């Protein structure tokens, strides 16, 4: 990559939490497209990062589950060096408690939207893959490794995301694209607050990973030398 052509990264879920932390980690190295639903929050992150590094930052406000809107939003991207899927949703409940609507919503956001965005961006990723390499990082979950009681629909969507990554990795290796699944344990985010409230516990963010720690794992996958492929990363809170 020449000095006149900085690599470009697109991050979904970039308006808060892990996605925003990833954006901060990548800003010194990449031009950024910040994806998310909340235009005001995206603009706030973009304003924070603009001027903090040498790269360009722009926002892409779109509902990932709206296929037509998503296709339109991504249509102009001709080359993409890194795609980080950080957007996701989580709703807990036993199988008995969980309606079909909840199952569909979690799979739509956590799996189908990821697959569709990736499919639309494959030509741009392959363009970079054939010219130095490209990366796709799926911010998954510990629930994509182990399913616990009350986590059935969420864990099932994350197991499916892991399977998607495994298939994609094998399919795109010949195009110079690496695919990494990052499986964090509990992270100090708004989603984690909702989880703890659902469990009836008292929230103590110091017990959990910081979003910046997960973002560091994402950066490690992206910056690994091209002879190395970090296929899966497990990140757990200390203690």
Report the location of each language-model feature.
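Active-site-adjacent segment of SDR/Rossmann-fold oxidoreductases
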Residues: 146, 167-177
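Substrate-binding pocket helix/loop in short-chain dehydrogenase/reductase
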Residues: 94-95, 99-107
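Residue(s) in the substrate-gating loop at a strand-loop-helix junction
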Residues: 141
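Conserved glycine-rich Rossmann-like NAD(P)H-binding loop of the short-chain dehydrogenase/reductase
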Residues: 29-45
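Conserved glycine-rich cofactor-binding loop
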Residues: 15-16
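C-terminal helical subdomain
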Residues: 177, 181, 201-239
């Amino acid at each position: 990559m020449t000095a006149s052509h900085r690599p470009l990264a697109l991050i979904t879920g970039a308006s808060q939490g892990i996605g925003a932390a990833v954006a901060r980690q990548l800003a010194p190295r990449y031009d950024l497209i910040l994806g998310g639903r909340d235009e005001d929050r995206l603009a706030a992150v973009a304003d924070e990062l603009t001027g903090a590094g040498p790269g360009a930052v722009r926002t892409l406000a779109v509902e990932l589950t709206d296929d037509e809107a998503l296709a339109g939003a991504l249509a102009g991207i001709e080359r993409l060096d890194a795609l980080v899927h950080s957007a996701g949703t989580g709703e807990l409940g036993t199988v008995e408690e969980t309606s079909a609507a909840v199952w569909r919503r979690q799979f739509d956001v956590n799996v189908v939207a990821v697959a569709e965005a990736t499919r639309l961006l494959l030509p741009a990723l392959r363009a970079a893959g054939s010219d130095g390499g490209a990366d796709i990082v799926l911010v998954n979950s510990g629930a994509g490794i182990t399913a616990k009681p009350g986590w059935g629909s969420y864990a099932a969507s994350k197991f499916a995301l892991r399977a998607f990554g495994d298939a994609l990795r094998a399919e795109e290796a010949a195009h110079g694209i690496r695919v990494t699944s990052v499986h964090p344990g509990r992270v100090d985010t708004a989603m984690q607050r909702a989880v703890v409230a659902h469990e009836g516990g008292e929230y103590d963010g110091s017990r959990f990973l910081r979003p910046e720690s997960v973002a560091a794992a994402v950066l490690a996958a992206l910056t690994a030398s091209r002879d190395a492929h970090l296929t899966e990363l497990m990140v757990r809170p200390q203690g």
